Amino acid sequence: MNYALLSNGITTALEKEGSIEWFPVPKFDSPSVFTKILDEDKGGYFLITPEKFNKVKQQYVEYSLILRTEFDDGNLILIDFLPLSLPAIIRLYEAKVPFNVEVKPLFNYGLVNAGTETRKDGIIYKNPESKEGLELLINGDYKIISPYRITVNSGKGYLYLLYSRDLRYGLFSQKGFVYSEPYEAYSKLLYYSRKELERARKPSIYENAFYRSLSVILGLIYKPSGGIIASPTTSIPEIVGDERNWDYRYVWVRDSSYAIEALVKANLLTHARRALDFLTNLLDPSSKSFDHPFYSVDGTPPPAEENLDWLSGFMNSKPVRIGNAAYLQIQMDIEGAYMNALYEYYKRTLDKDYISSIFWAVEAISDWVSSSWRGESTDIWEERGISRHYTHTKLMSWVALDRASKLAKDLGYNKLFEEWKSRANEIKIDILNNGVKDNHHFVRYYGGDEIDAALLTLPIYDFIPATDTLFMNTLKKIDEELRVADGLYLRYKKDFMGLAKNPFTLVTTWMARVYIRLKEFDRARWLLETLIKCNQDLGLIGEHVDPETCEARGNYPHLFPHSGMVLSILEFDEVR
């Protein structure tokens, strides 16, 4: 799956070899108008290719999310990007040969055919069921064969496709002059991308993987709110032909907290602060701190899950789902994820004024965790219909109170410090008494025999030293039972849908971070290099990977492994 990600912090697109096959508008979690990635025949696409070609080379411009596609050693060169602040696609071209353009938008995930209107300078594609539409402005020596096919002669020019909720304010309206000139938009985006990454810490190893992962994290931040989505796609299957197809275009408290840690460690503190503020504003002091595991990009509750039965699915993997029913789950680990991210931000900035201003959130979470940690819940892996006393969930309750106690101590709240520290110790004792099998190794849930990869986070969150015998035994079992290829691991053996098959890429970065703590640096580097080799040509990592082909599986690219890559690389620098 060698798709390139294009993003401007408003929406995203996925492109492969000149064909844009995913484009939700106007924002990350909106219905798509190009959906070919989920249905070869009915999905819709925006294709630019020469009449004939033998080879295609794709690469990003520097560490931006601007894509350069070259056909046959320069016969046709495309520069594709989403301009800042607009739900639009700009495609600059330089051609030595004539080429073809095919534009086939279908509104509402391929369900609604577009009405068309040909203009002197381009084409309008209207949604007959609303005021929205797309407008294609064409620059160069071209001929419109039909509303869906254009031929362009050699030379330089561009194609500018803009989405409008109301076509009265689009490119061809009297207000069209306000939209960016394409070449200027390119320069602005490249300058902006450079400036963002210039602020980041410079790593001593794996520079390409580091900056590409950072650019992906930044590309998944919804700029109007600061929320960070887990992935730009829906229903890319974990296993081809299976039903493990989910919509990840939402802001998971857990995933975004992990990304905040990566941003903090990378010194991109403004983005980290905005993402923290987004999560803080979702807190409910009167109930469970986060009443949903994830939210829409504007902070509203996510939509209910539904199947799009008219789409055949990625490689015929049905169903295609939008929305996500996991939003109804009670997940008791997420408060700890947030608290750890907040604490990491504080450690980096020592900004007591900021922590004081949101200490109500620290208290609300600590009170809720203190009164609720003994209950059962769904775990980090979001198994449907199953609640247990998961060891990782208890760990994150410990993390919440441990970090809260440290913040309270630094702010001079000594009584709260003692109270929360005592409760954290109580949880720790409970885990050591109930989350361990035969005094030998940790288990996935109390009273069970299974292990899972989330147990790798025990030393990462400083619950227990990586050298502790209990953990070393656990590490050995994970390596023996969950490893399916060199450096690649399942997150668990089975779930409510059956046996797991494809490795979960985040686990490789967890493993690397564990071996860094064990000072086995060669092993840690080998693990990261294994994942880097599977990163596709463009350096993007999916949620899963096929252990035989190294091809990405699951939603793509995914926030978790890119955050883990950044954290792993920077932790190398801290111990060297």
Swiss-Prot record:
GO molecular function: alpha,alpha-trehalase activity
Keyword Transcription regulation attached: no
Keywords on record: Carbohydrate metabolism, Glycosidase, Hydrolase
Source species of the chain: Sulfolobus acidocaldarius (strain ATCC 33909 / DSM 639 / JCM 8929 / NBRC 15157 / NCIMB 11770)
Temperature dependence of activity: Optimum temperature is 70 degrees Celsius.
Name of this protein: Trehalase 2
Protein family per UniProt: Belongs to the glycosyl hydrolase 15 family.
Biological or metabolic pathway of the protein: Glycan degradation; trehalose degradation; D-glucose from alpha,alpha-trehalose: step 1/1
EC number: 3.2.1.28
Cited function: Catalyzes the hydrolysis of alpha,alpha-trehalose into two molecules of D-glucose.
Activity vs pH: Optimum pH is 3.7. More than half of the maximal activity is observed over a range between pH 3.5 and 4.5.
Entries under NCBIfam families matching the protein: trehalase_H1_Arch, trehalase_H2_Arch
GO biological process: trehalose catabolic process
Keyword Protein transport included in the entry's annotation: no
Domain of life: Archaea
